[in-house]
């Protein structure tokens, strides 16, 4: 499952349709899994770094939980599990804890579930996507959707994760406190 290719269309809207684009973005939803583990040093979370040429030199503020968009009528938790497997090559199952959803700066809503588990971050196998590269060259190249993964303490994760997802780390702490 780690070698499938997914075509991701990139289109630019004329200024006249900017309001339509904003409305569509506000309706977009993602579902993801926040995998965590306990070590002697404390709580660690599993994050992924997006692949492709735009993210190559970005590190702090570029990482994410494994997640992806899902369609209306699709079960968000099943979508989150599928995205986790597509982006990492690992399956995850067990007692999922729903976290409060977060609205991203661009309007996208993220539904996330936390689960305790472990995996070898250095062994991920991500699916691929295709895009024109270099821009306006007429050539298409394939890139991994995720180019690397890692385990981070919460302190480091807050620096690595996308700004709009920091709240998920706080939600994880709150969920663990509620669980006792």
Describe the residue ranges of each PLM region.
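Charged phosphate-binding loop/patch that engages nucleotide di/tri-phosphates or the phosphate backbone
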Residues: 154-180
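Short, charged/polar surface micro-motifs in flexible loops or helix N-caps
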Residues: 40-42, 52-55, 71, 106-107, ...
């Amino acid at each position: 499952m780690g070698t499938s290719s997914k075509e991701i269309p990139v289109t630019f809207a004329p200024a006249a349709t900017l309001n339509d684009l904003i409305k569509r973005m506000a309706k977009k939803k993602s579902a993801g899994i926040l995998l965590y583990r306990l070590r002697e040093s404390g709580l660690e979370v599993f994050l992924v770094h997006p692949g492709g040429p735009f993210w190559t030199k970005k590190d702090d503020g570029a990482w994410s939980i494994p997640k992806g968009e899902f369609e209306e009528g699709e079960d968000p938790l099943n979508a989150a599990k599928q995205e986790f497997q597509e982006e990492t090559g690992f399956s995850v199952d067990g007692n999922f804890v729903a976290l409060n959803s977060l609205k991203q700066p661009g309007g996208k809503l993220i539904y996330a579930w936390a689960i305790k588990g472990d995996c070898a971050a250095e062994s991920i196998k991500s699916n691929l996507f295709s895009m024109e590269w270099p821009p306006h060259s007429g050539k298409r190249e394939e890139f991994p959707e995720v180019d690397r993964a890692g385990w981070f303490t919460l302190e480091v994760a807050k620096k690595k994760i996308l700004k709009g997802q920091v709240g998920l780390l706080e939600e994880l702490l709150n969920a663990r406190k509620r669980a006792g």
